[in-house]
């Protein structure tokens, strides 16, 4: 018998275009904005890892009790890629993304959202 469970998680990927490259190279601002965004939904931040590339670009990962948030900047394209997965529920992450997006003020966004279903294979 196949059992299909309700969605147990949510994954959001967003590509943000038209961001000022001075912002995209400001690792401190982006990391603060990302932490503040995660606080919008009370995500449990277990660890933060970040790395600034030379001559430009930045990547950061927030390891969450609920899974992760990861970003990577492409200043040469005025672009940032945001990815969030949360196992708390199918609506999680939307407030986090919206807050983060407002801080960066992109001219255009491409958002893909996917409900993650886990089916018992036993």
Q: What role is predicted for each listed range?
A:
Residues 1-122:
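Polybasic/polar functional segments that serve as interface/processing modules
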